[in-house]
Design a protein with these regions (language model features):
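Extended catalytic cores of very large enzyme megasubunits
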Residues: 1-273
Length: 273
């Protein structure tokens, strides 16, 4: 007999966020099936000699007496096997290296929340943007995967730091609405990534001859989060850590910021002291 969650709201959250679609049955999982998928996955990763009370754990989760990592509950199985970052609820990175941006993209695409620091002691370690940015014949070809998106963004930013404005080819990215069979949900299509390329180019163009400001770093990360759609359902979760005397970040959400900088809605901002 299937275990029912106590309320309609809990049913909705389970079905919309955690229940995977079962192709064989032509429907989404029941609560029991979601828990069984989770237990089965971690059982397969555990030494048989270890006496883990799997039946007790299953019963406790079914009855909401304990709860595992909700990211794992969503992804346990092929999705978690492929991208193990998807098992973590949250992560942290300091923006002290140009690779931080594409790493954040990958982590967010796995559904994991990101805390990031734009404290000046970190952002000052970034290189200067060249005074001369010129169009090049280089084309960044985007592969249709999380790693593909992140790798293409790393290449695009690296080329900007070398003074080259690359073209991009998103022809391999599946169209919007197509099913994501491994991770679940629907594809967002290539348009959001193209939007990110244009946004990043605009910021780098304004920053020619100097380093990116803390606010510019913050905005790039927020824009990355804005274009990431995890499993067609889960949006990005961010917290931005700043210097306590950073007036630009302090006023980042003052006035009608949402009119021209709507990406800033994606992150909470907290001062470090």
């Amino acid at each position: 007999m299937s275990t029912r969650l106590p309320s309609i709201y809990q049913d909705f959250i389970h079905i919309s966020r955690y229940a995977r679609f079962n192709d064989d049955l032509g429907r989404r999982e029941t609560w029991d099936e979601t828990v069984d998928r989770y237990i089965s996955y971690f059982k397969s990763k555990t030494d048989n000699n270890k006496k883990v009370p799997w039946d007790e754990l299953r019963t406790a989760i079914l009855n909401l007496e304990v709860m595992p990592s909700m990211r794992c509950l969503m992804t346990a199985g092929p999705a978690l096997e492929k991208d193990q970052v998807a098992g973590y609820n949250c992560s942290y990175v300091a923006i002290d290296n140009v690779k931080a941006f594409d790493e954040i993209m990958y982590v967010l695409m796995c559904g994991t929340g990101v805390g990031f620091s734009v404290e000046s002691k970190y952002t000052n370690k970034l290189p200067e943007v060249p005074e001369d940015l010129h169009e090049s014949d280089t084309t960044v070809v985007v592969a249709d995967s999380k790693i593909g998106w992140a790798s293409s963004y790393r290449e695009f930013i690296s080329l900007l730091y070398s003074g080259k404005i690359a073209k991009w080819d998103v022809s391999k990215v599946r169209p919007s609405g197509e099913r994501l069979k491994t991770f679940g949900g629907r594809a967002s299509g290539p348009e959001p990534l193209v939007d990110l390329f244009k946004f990043t180019l605009n910021i780098f163009t304004k920053a020619r001859g100097r380093k990116l400001s803390t606010l510019e770093c913050h905005d790039i990360v927020c824009k990355i989060a804005d274009i990431v759609v995890c499993g067609g359902v889960r949006r990005s979760a961010l917290i931005s850590l700043t210097d306590i005397n950073d007036d630009q970040l302090r006023h980042a959400k003052s006035g009608d910021w949402w009119t021209h900088n709507g990406q800033r809605a994606l992150a909470n901002i907290s001062a470090v002291y």
